[in-house]
């Protein structure tokens, strides 16, 4: 149990995919201007990653390995992720048109979000058992969503602040991201 808790803390805080691995930077910079968009994207990414991880893990060990088709893992995972994103997009469009509109082009970009594929590949390459795979696949997108939410709240406050003209927009956002990365590096000693 302690090992699973350490894996959860590591995947959420210590090895955060945005701040330490620099994965998922496109939605991080693009969707973080409003809290509502960041929350919607965070929930969508959590859902897609958890389901994609479960499906790809099962496909890999129940289909690809027995048929000795392990070399097909990448293309199989990409197809699974693309299908899940399409289903998620259709669901959000039907249930929350405002969220769908606010996410814009970033929702279909979850298909190419390297965080999703990274989680699926790390589960296989690290030979995680089912419990480890589940914890890592929940922790990583939760860390993504946490950082996205914190960053969006800071960016909303920055919109109300006086920022020098040279730093308005993305420059100040990148400075804030660097400070956040430094702050999150303090969690390294926990595990």
Spans of model-derived segments:
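C-terminal ends of transmembrane helices
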Residues: 23-37, 85-99, 151-162
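Juxtamembrane transmembrane-helix termini in multi-pass membrane transport proteins
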Residues: 10-47
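Generic transmembrane alpha-helix signature in multi-pass membrane proteins
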Residues: 22-30, 89-94, 106-107, 114-127
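Interfacial loop-to-transmembrane junctions
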Residues: 156-174
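Juxtamembrane boundary at the C-terminal end of a transmembrane helix
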Residues: 1-3, 182-191
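Ordered, amphipathic secondary-structure segments that act as subunit-interaction surfaces
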Residues: 61-104
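Structural signature of hydrophobic alpha-helical transmembrane segments
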Residues: 3-19, 68-83, 134-147
